[in-house]
């Protein structure tokens, strides 16, 4: 394989923009499947990439299946990513291993809330992208509007590479502005590409749009700029070089268009992927050297260097755990010995395969830059595998904290065993899915990113693991904090025969207003009134006290603690004595520091026909929502608001019924905010009643 020609790409989009349909067409044109199936298939087959039973039924892509195709002797690994906010960890994970992406947009709806989330993730991982404006055959299609929205809403330098020949039901092809030719897609499934001269009625528009394209590209190539300014013809290769340079520098987003469903424009998009998106050689990747204070190391696409690979996705296959791996340096071969840098355990590579949606192809070897899968390796998602001669770790992926929890109870003994297996599997697969047993209620609690996220796992428990479970009401992950400053001076003393316990801790607590930090410990002890070896004990005690607040039993956050005095006893003082003194000191001051309750606030985006805008405002106002923005775009409206998570349970059902099923919403965690006094009293009462019972 020529690794200069390799492309690792993701297809990212808002839900229902036609992303899986586009992938399906790509598989078809690259001869990976022999018939095209629709997403919510009338033929009962479902799209090839949606291999989980649940995905085919719901018509949403949940797990990002990886597939390998070849287009005009360019090998391409495609990661199909989910478009639903509740599954963003899948998206984040895929982006971590990609070199380039196609951002799919609906030509009517344009840039939607999830497109914004996905774009933010693409920016976080510096992924170059092309835009594909899909569904140009839909009523109300306006690719020019979408191109403008890419600029206004996503701040992308979007430049048209094509213009449509006809829109809505008259959409029959596209004009390539670089080659100045018209392309039509004919024959069964659009396999015959017919190149013709541009229709006379579109020639003027094509010339104008080409001028605009060349103006935009002049920034990326001096030769192009000179020729263009002198009014000379610019060679095609120079135009292609400028587009590639701008795209790789993340300063240009080339815009292509068509209709995947109607088989228009997909092959030209594939040409663009090979021409303008990066090969692994074009991207800089780094690892941390764990033997050298996590020093950053540049990795090189070189088969002769020691192997470094990242496990980015786990799945249960029929032959055990299937681990998807991106090779960043060196090679993977059957029988090769590697080490997992997180666990320091050595293992041998067994079966090595290339994936096509859910079919496998055995291979002997994977080279630098490639994406392959391994069978039967024990690991967690995000682990780094490397040659035993080095100890590198790929920088860890950003993992958001869960915002919702749910109690799950197995219906019988068999279900209990199966549920335990399922939970073990899911927590390894998905770092945003967490589980624990509540000590007081003895219930198993699962936590995740939203109702749909947890709902899918409960369904999977039933289907894949035959675990019948009952679920409780969803619970919000509240937090407690303080709003004032309070002093403490606490002595812990215990004498009960033998060695006693003694420790005194004094100081104060105050609110911590530091972005991204929830606790700070400051040691101002002088003169050894608390010996140095017991300072960490105090720190540990304070952190222990913060695990469970006294208001409603949730963790305490955003506190700065300063200790400035204390006392010890030469015999009775110990690590545990100072831990307990700190816990007592914390509780003494906490009551005086005006504690309050915080709740997760979500950024909620509603989108639907303008006729329902009033209903959308009403629904948000009823839920303590603060409207932060609204946009009317002809017949289409979008409303953005900040709404407490506790008010959003069951919202999808309410929204459907009040907008005739025509509006949709997405939400993601934004911040924690103080609860109003009425809610504060309600939560306190509920907590106290539970404690009494």
UniProtKB/Swiss-Prot annotation:
One of its GO terms (cellular component) is cytoplasm. SMART domains: EFG_C, EFG_IV. Keywords: Cytoplasm, Elongation factor, GTP-binding, Nucleotide-binding, Protein biosynthesis. Residues 4-281 form the tr-type G domain. It comes from the Bacteria. The keyword S-adenosyl-L-methionine does not apply. This is Elongation factor G 1.
């Amino acid at each position: 394989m020529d690794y200069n020609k390799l492309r690792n790409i993701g297809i990212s989009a808002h839900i229902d923009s036609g992303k899986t349909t586009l992938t399906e067409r790509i598989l078809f044109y690259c001869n990976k499947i022999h018939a095209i199936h629709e997403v919510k298939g009338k033929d009962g087959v479902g799209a090839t990439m949606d291999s989980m039973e649940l995905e085919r039924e719901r018509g949403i892509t949940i797990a990002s299946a990886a597939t390998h195709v070849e287009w005009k002797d360019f090998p391409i690994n495609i990661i199909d990513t989910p478009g639903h906010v509740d599954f963003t960890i899948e998206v984040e994970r895929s982006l971590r291993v990609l070199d380039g992406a196609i951002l799919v947009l609906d030509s009517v709806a344009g840039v939607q809330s999830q497109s914004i989330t996905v774009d933010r993730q693409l920016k976080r991982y510096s992924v170059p992208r092309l835009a594909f404006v899909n569904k140009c055959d839909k009523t109300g299609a306006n690719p020019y509007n979408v191109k403008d929205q890419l600029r206004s809403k996503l701040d992308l330098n979007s430049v048209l590479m094509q213009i449509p020949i006809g829109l809505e039901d008259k959409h029959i092809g596209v004009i390539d502005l670089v080659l100045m030719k018209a392309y039509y897609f004919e024959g069964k499934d659009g396999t015959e590409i017919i190149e013709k001269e541009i229709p006379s009625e579109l020639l003027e528009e094509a010339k104008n749009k080409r001028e605009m394209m060349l103006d935009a590209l002049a920034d990326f190539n001096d030769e192009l700029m000179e020729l263009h300014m002198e009014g000379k013809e610019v060679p095609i290769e120079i135009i292609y070089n400028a587009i590639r340079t701008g795209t790789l520098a993340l300063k240009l987003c080339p815009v292509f268009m068509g209709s995947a469903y109607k088989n228009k424009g997909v092959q030209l998009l594939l040409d663009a992927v090979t021409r303008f998106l990066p090969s692994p050689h074009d991207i800089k990747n780094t690892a941390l050297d764990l033997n050298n204070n996590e020093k950053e190391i540049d990795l090189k696409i070189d088969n002769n260097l020691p192997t470094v690979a990242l496990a980015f996705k786990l799945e249960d296959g029929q032959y055990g755990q299937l681990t998807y791996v991106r090779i960043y340096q060196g090679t993977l071969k059957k029988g090769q010995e590697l080490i997992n840098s997180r666990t320091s355990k050595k293992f041998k590579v067994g079966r090595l395969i290339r994936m096509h949606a859910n079919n496998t192809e055995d291979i002997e070897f994977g080279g630098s830059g490639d994406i392959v899968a391994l069978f039967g390796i024990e690991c967690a998602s995000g682990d780094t595998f490397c040659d035993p001669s080095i100890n590198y770790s790929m920088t860890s992926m950003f993992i958001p904290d869960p915002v919702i929890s749910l109690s799950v109870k197995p219906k019988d003994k068999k279900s209990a065993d199966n549920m335990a297996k399922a939970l073990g599997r899911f927590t390894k697969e998905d770092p945003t899915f967490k589980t624990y047993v509540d000590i007081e209620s003895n219930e198993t609690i699962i936590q995740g990113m939203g109702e749909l996220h947890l709902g899918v796992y409960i369904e999977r428990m039933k289907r894949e693991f035959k675990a019948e479970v009952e679920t409780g009401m969803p619970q919000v992950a509240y937090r407690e904090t303080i709003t004032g400053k309070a002093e403490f001076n606490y002595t812990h003393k215990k004498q009960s025969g033998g060695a006693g316990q003694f420790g005194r801790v004094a100081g104060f607590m105050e609110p911590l207003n530091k972005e991204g930090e929830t606790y700070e410990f400051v040691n101002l002890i002088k003169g050894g009134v608390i010996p140095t070896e017991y300072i960490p004990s105090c720190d540990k005690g304070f952190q222990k006290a913060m695990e469970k607040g006294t208001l409603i039993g949730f963790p305490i956050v955003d506190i700065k603690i300063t200790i400035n005095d204390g006392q010890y006893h030469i015999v009775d003082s110990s690590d545990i004595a100072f831990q307990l003194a700190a816990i007592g000191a914390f509780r003494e001051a906490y009551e005086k520091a005006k504690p309050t309750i915080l709740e997760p606030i979500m950024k909620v985006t509603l989108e639907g026909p303008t006729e329902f805008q009033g209903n959308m405002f009403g629904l948000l106002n009823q839920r303590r929502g603060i409207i932060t923005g609204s946009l009317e775009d002809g017949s289409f409206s979008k409303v953005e608001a900040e709404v407490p998570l506790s008010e959003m349970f069951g919202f999808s059902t309410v929204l459907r019924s009040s907008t005739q099923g025509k509006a949709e919403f997405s939400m993601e965690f934004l911040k924690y905010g103080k609860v109003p006094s009425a809610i504060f009293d309600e939560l306190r009462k509920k907590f106290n009643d539970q404690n009494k019972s």
